[in-house]
From Swiss-Prot:
The lineage of its organism: Bacteria, Pseudomonadati, Pseudomonadota, Alphaproteobacteria, Caulobacterales. Pfam families: Ribosomal_L18p. GO terms for biological process: translation. Belongs to the universal ribosomal protein uL18 family. One of its GO terms (cellular component) is cytosolic large ribosomal subunit. This is one of the proteins that bind and probably mediate the attachment of the 5S RNA into the large ribosomal subunit, where it forms part of the central protuberance. Gene3D superfamilies: 3.30.420.100. Part of the 50S ribosomal subunit; part of the 5S rRNA/L5/L18/L25 subcomplex. Contacts the 5S and 23S rRNAs. NCBIfam families: L18_bact. SUPFAM superfamilies: Translational machinery components. Signal peptide: none annotated. Keywords: Ribonucleoprotein, Ribosomal protein, RNA-binding, rRNA-binding. This is Large ribosomal subunit protein uL18.
Amino acid sequence: MALSPRESAAKRAQRVRTRLKSLANGRPRLSVFRSSKNIYAQVIDDERGVTLASASTLEAEGKGADKDAAAAVGKLVAERAIEKGVKDVVFDRGSYIFHGRVKALADAAREAGLNF
């Protein structure tokens, strides 16, 4: 029986997260969630189970869900993570392909000083 779209996305996200665990080496992960109206990013320390920094289009300058708003979120989450002393992260794209808004967020976070 074929998987539903929700089950397929969960399976993709789990596959990505499993690979990240082997690559992390104690680094926190930059997790991205994308909805039709907003984009959210968090820097999460999985060893302690704590969110170190977060940002979304709900609070960033560019409200909405376009590439410019995603870039603003990437810059904001990177600045907040660097304030907390986090410079090295692993990028968790979840079930999303590395394209469009997700790529814009990642590029802006790299430009703002995060290494991944």
